[in-house]
């Protein structure tokens, strides 16, 4: 239960909500659904479905206020306000984990009389003589479950774990999403001949380490903190690759261009200590980090420390060029002017001491951006353009709202707002 959402840090936008007024005060009035929609369009290079984007941005405020009251969620200002957003609007839960979100929502739902069936994988749909969907059949390890319903909200997630559905764009990228994201709905809804769009689009992020072949863990909080403290990204050739304080899309694209699609974060002792603290806070254990260092750079994930020459040799970086790169960066930091990438001077900091840490950084994805086609009403559409009157979609299974590249916090924004709208539309039809 929880899908890809349960793996993230609970970040979401609060545009138009009472929650935003509480968290951001007067500054919340400077934001608007239109401003958020413009940011979405700009980030996705206008590949987004404007109708879905508008629906998302106009409803996220009410949706956040509803779930906050329904499940007693105490949202606060997110630790990181990412530069992709033109204004501070990102909030998160105290635990910085969507596990808290899913757990509390599930508890509140069952207290209201709702039922949650685990170990129940939908295998096929039930239809009447006219072809209308009347329910589903799910299989578990010990039972078959048949559910008859007049209204169905489809929130089965994406297809990132299904290698047969993955396209060229995902090649060479590590996956950190749930292994349950197998695109089941695209199989069991096949009899309806539904429209799909953008299958093969993925939300690709930087800040990953490959903990198993093809499987990643994210280091976003730690990596962002490190670059705020002045850390730099280098490639195997020992060169800097990007303005480390730029938006995530710039960093992501720069990493994809490097040898083996990999970069390295170079840190001093003071930066590593902050980096380490945030790793342990967000999904890593002290034991596994020690294990990574014990590998001494011989296999992924690469975590090494020592002198500059030692970390270069262990990580497979050109040591001579790395020294030249560091010397140049130190000069830029001292003069307050980055002559190579024009990095914001507030993030230019000299390295301290002679102990260095290097951690690999690879791009990764958990969520897919393509899916079924709907209108702003979120009813699924057939290939003939007909509206499926009693099935609504919500979350990752629907493609289009964020286009080809979503901003940070926008996948949660889409899942929460679309779920809210789909549920309201279903209730209206049932009345």
Where are these regions (language model features)?
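An anion/pyrophosphate-binding glycine-rich loop and adjacent beta-alpha core
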Residues: 186-190, 195-314
């Amino acid at each position: 239960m929880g899908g890809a959402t349960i793996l993230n840090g609970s970040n979401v936008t609060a545009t138009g909500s009472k929650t935003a007024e509480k968290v951001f005060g007067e500054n919340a009035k400077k934001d608007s659904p239109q401003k958020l929609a413009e940011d979405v369009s700009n980030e996705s290079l206008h590949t987004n479905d404007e109708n879905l984007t508008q629906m998302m941005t106009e409803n996220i405020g009410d949706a956040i206020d509803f779930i906050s009251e329904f499940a007693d969620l105490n949202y606060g200002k997110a630790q990181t306000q990412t530069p992709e957003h033109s204004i501070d609007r990102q909030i998160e839960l105290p635990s910085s984990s969507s596990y808290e979100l899913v757990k509390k929502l599930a508890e509140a739902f069952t207290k209201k009389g709702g039922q949650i069936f685990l170990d129940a994988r939908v295998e096929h749909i039930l239809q009447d003589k006219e072809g209308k969907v009347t329910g589903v059949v799910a299989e578990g390890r010990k039972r078959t479950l048949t559910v008859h319903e007049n209204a169905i909200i489809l929130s089965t997630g994406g297809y990132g774990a299904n290698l047969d559905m993955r396209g060229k764009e995902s090649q060479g990228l590590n996956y950190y999403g749930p292994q349950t994201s197998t695109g089941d709905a695209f199989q069991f809804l096949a009899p309806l001949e539904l429209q799909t769009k953008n299958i093969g689009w993925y939300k690709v992020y930087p800040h990953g380490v490959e903990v198993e072949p093809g499987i990643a863990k994210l280091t976003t909080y730690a990596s962002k903190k490190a670059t705020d403290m002045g850390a730099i990204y280098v490639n195997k050739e020992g060169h800097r690759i990007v303005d480390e304080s730029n938006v995530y899309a710039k960093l992501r694209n720069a990493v994809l261009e490097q040898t083996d699609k990999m970069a390295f974060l170079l840190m001093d002792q003071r930066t590593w200590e902050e980096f380490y603290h945030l790793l342990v806070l967000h999904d890593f254990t002290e034991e596994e980090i020690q294990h990574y260092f014990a590998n001494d750079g011989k296999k992924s994930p690469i975590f090494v420390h020592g002198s500059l020459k030692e970390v270069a040799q262990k990580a497979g970086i050109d040591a001579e060029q790395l020294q030249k790169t560091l010397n140049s960066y130190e000069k830029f930091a001292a003069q307050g002017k980055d002559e190579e990438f024009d990095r914001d001077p507030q993030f230019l900091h000299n390295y301290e001491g002679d102990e260095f840490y290097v951690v690999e950084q690879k791009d990764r994805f958990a969520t897919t951006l393509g899916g079924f086609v709907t209108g702003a009403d979120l009813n699924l559409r057939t290939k003939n353009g007909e509206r499926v009157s009693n099935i609504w979609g919500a979350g990752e299974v629907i493609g289009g709202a964020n286009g080809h590249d979503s901003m940070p916090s926008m996948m949660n924004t889409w899942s929460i707002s679309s779920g809210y709208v789909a549920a309201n539309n279903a209730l209206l039809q049932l009345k």
